[in-house]
Amino acid sequence: MSLDIVILAAGQGTRMRSALPKVLHPVAGNSMLGHVIHSARQLSPSGIHVVIGHGADAVREQLSADDLNFVMQDKQLGTGHAVAQALPALTADTVLILYGDVPLIEVETLSRLLERVNPQQLGLLTVALDDPTGYGRIVRDDQNRVCAIVEHKDASDAQKAITEGNTGILAVPAAHLADWLGRLSNNNAQGEYYLTDVIAMAANDGLVVATEQPHDAMEVQGANDRKQLSELERHYQMREARRLMAAGVTLRDPARFDVRGEVIVGRDVLIDINVILEGKVVIEDDVVIGPNCVIKDSTLRKGVVVKANSHIEGAILGEGSDAGPFARLRPGSVLGAKAHVGNFVELKNANLGEGAKVGHLTYLGDAEIGARTNIGAGTITCNYDGANKHKTTLGADVFIGSNNSLVAPVDILDGATTAAGSTITQNVPAEQLGVARARQRNIEGWKRPVKISKD
């Protein structure tokens, strides 16, 4: 079975009170539409067709990709009209219709729905609700067959008592779709062409309307305002927390933990409160992450410890290494096995060898640090000359005294030492001491200034 997917994403979202198109509002660091596209791709369709309207340029700019076909709906005349705009591009046997503001839909749910489709049967995703206000109602005949969907505003009191709601998500045999869309009318309370009207047409044409339901009603929850958006965010985060805990992660408080990307975890990982994981993060076995940390696009090898209030981005932390508290590792930072980065240390494009130590109050940028080298407090690499970046290279077993300025490009070779307070501008040979500071003078008879009285 070949598959085309149509994603409706043309709505304005006035209740968001935002210049940003509704479908671009984020859930867990990705736009709502981005989540839907991600799910659609996992179904391996022949084509993904995104119907856009309000804020079309912004949607294209943020989400443009070779596998997406953007279709313009100039006037928002209803869901049926929106799907009709994509008709000329549809070539597959089956068409699945999704919504750009329903980001939590699970691929497993969509797969079950697609299994219900054949040339004489379409699949409709419905949901059981305690309060179906606002949802179209699923109308069944005396044999429990779906015969129509009635929108809430058009429903009678008896129909409003129905608790089975329409999610809007359906999969249909493509051979019938053009005919059904061509027969739609806008003779309703909204004056729109409802996609839901094709259900009654299908039933009247003798097709079976087979229904599926999500395991979790929040899968089909959309967001029309900021409150609903926050509810989707919290539900997504709790879902991710449950997934990670099932994989062997201890979360001190699942309600105070956020995932905003893709996280791969090992076993016996401990994550404290207020930790944010962004982008692609790999966390191997026995890692400990302290409170209030942000980790983005990074890999933490087995046994890594990240202490409180650290920010790690684009970094690789080797087995048994540690960072923090209050450490900042910027993109390109690599810690070798058992390397140590302490409090108020910032690394950028710096490679620390196995067992290297940078204890505190240090900046290392564009630097190669050898194994077992120790960097004293207050050391900085002066790597930028105002136009270009330059590299600092320290060999193995180097000892850098406190309050050093290492003016790049400079090499300090194996076993060398630099004296505290030095400004190193020349290479230091192996096993030698580099001293680059003014000689101290003690002035005999010097008197400390006395404060002048204002009287």
Curated annotation (Swiss-Prot):
Please tell me one Gene Ontology term that the record gives under cellular component: cytoplasm
Q: Where is the active site?
A: 360 (proton acceptor)
Residues annotated to bind Mg(2+) = 101, 224
Annotated SUPFAM superfamilies = Nucleotide-diphospho-sugar transferases (SSF53448), Trimeric LpxA-like enzymes (SSF51161)
What GO terms are given for molecular function?
A: glucosamine-1-phosphate N-acetyltransferase activity; magnesium ion binding; UDP-N-acetylglucosamine diphosphorylase activity
Does the keyword section mention Hydrolase? no
As to how many cofactors bind and how, the note says: Binds 1 Mg(2+) ion per subunit.
- Provide this UniProt record's keywords sorted from A to Z: Acyltransferase, Cell shape, Cell wall biogenesis/degradation, Cytoplasm, Magnesium, Metal-binding, Multifunctional enzyme, Nucleotidyltransferase, Peptidoglycan synthesis, Repeat, Transferase
Give the pathway listed in the UniProt entry for this protein.
Nucleotide-sugar biosynthesis; UDP-N-acetyl-alpha-D-glucosamine biosynthesis; N-acetyl-alpha-D-glucosamine 1-phosphate from alpha-D-glucosamine 6-phosphate (route II): step 2/2; Nucleotide-sugar biosynthesis; UDP-N-acetyl-alpha-D-glucosamine biosynthesis; UDP-N-acetyl-alpha-D-glucosamine from N-acetyl-alpha-D-glucosamine 1-phosphate: step 1/1; Bacterial outer membrane biogenesis; LPS lipid A biosynthesis
Which InterPro entries does this chain map to?
Answer: Bifunctional_GlmU, GlmU-like, GlmU_C_LbH, Hexapep, MobA-like_NTP_Trfase, Nucleotide-diphossugar_trans, Trimer_LpxA-like_sf
Q: What does this protein do?
A: Catalyzes the last two sequential reactions in the de novo biosynthetic pathway for UDP-N-acetylglucosamine (UDP-GlcNAc). The C-terminal domain catalyzes the transfer of acetyl group from acetyl coenzyme A to glucosamine-1-phosphate (GlcN-1-P) to produce N-acetylglucosamine-1-phosphate (GlcNAc-1-P), which is converted into UDP-GlcNAc by the transfer of uridine 5-monophosphate (from uridine 5-triphosphate), a reaction catalyzed by the N-terminal domain.
Family affiliation:
In the N-terminal section; belongs to the N-acetylglucosamine-1-phosphate uridyltransferase family. In the C-terminal section; belongs to the transferase hexapeptide repeat family.
Q: What is this protein called?
A: Bifunctional protein GlmU
